[in-house]
UniProtKB/Swiss-Prot annotation:
Annotated Gene Ontology cellular component terms: chromatin; nucleolar chromatin; nucleolus; preribosome
Protein name: FK506-binding protein 39 kDa
One term of GO molecular function: molecular condensate scaffold activity
PANTHER family cross-referenced by the UniProt entry: 39 KDA FK506-BINDING NUCLEAR PROTEIN, FKBP-TYPE PEPTIDYL-PROLYL CIS-TRANS ISOMERASE FKPA
Amino acid sequence: MSLPIAVYSLSVKGKDVPAVEESTDASIHLTMASIDAGEKSNKPTTLLVKVRPRIPVEDEDDEELDEQMQELLEESQREFVLCTLKPGSLYQQPLNLTITPGDEVFFSASGDATIHLSGNFLVDEEDEEEEESDEDYDLSPTEEDLVETVSGDEESEEESESEDNSASEEDELDSAPAKKAQVKKKRTKDESEQEEAASPKKNNTKKQKVEGTPVKEKKVAFAEKLEQGPTGPAAKKEKQQASSNAPSSPKTRTLKGGVVVTDVKTGSGASATNGKKVEMRYIGKLENGKVFDKNTKGKPFAFILGRGEVIRGWDVGVAGMQEGGERKITIPAPMAYGNQSIPGIPKNSTLVFEVKLVRVH
């Protein structure tokens, strides 16, 4: 599957305007040809395209092709009409034309108007060798909960082992002063009763200093903590904090053109507003659940919001999102591709996108 990586645009006026100034490994998918509504001339303008194989130039000595190679290029060259636009009646024409890296393409406009082409640079998904970054598509909520649960269990086990070790060390400290007291008691049998009475008191004071909190009390407190489990004071506090940070139930709204958005997760970063460049992750589906396009790894899909670089449903549905936010956008056919049929999308299709806003520039 091909993935869009950048917006393509070209203004054509006159003859033999190259599709790209330099060779590129990416294909070009043309989706629209249009003219400015402010064109003064009312004459129609026809867009022609000339296609021929690209000949790699490996050496400066090869820059001038010999006559035989030139004849071969002319024989294999194809030229055809893409569309005809006329100010006042026809301002734009949807296209579905892919230019591969192996083709050398030139556009010509036979008329007074300037024709503007737009589309996307594409790369094959299997050709992407970039490792997945931190900005790759997030885990689903259930997977995140599972990771947090496992982490929490490991921390609890470490805490339990730490407290058990602490209790063992205190038991050893308890036994040491007890033995010392017994030895001292044997040595002081013949001393006066006053000295015998003072000796235990001194030993008890020393024992309390060494012990700090009695071991029994610590063990009881630790047992109570285990018995309390998730209903203990600390757990209640954590639960309250988690519930306060947890997102509320998804909010669904209907926007311009019948576009329906559901905020699955509210972001906390910069807001997406018209004129700003946004970087997105997305999965595009038909109403039957069939995936026709996606961008879940590698370089995020980027475009300028509100400039018409994407279908109108995206300009409407993405507006207002914040960095880190996730949203489900349901786009009716008139706000998508209408009665136009493109690969993977039948005409008059309602499209469903699950999107995440990665960054706002």
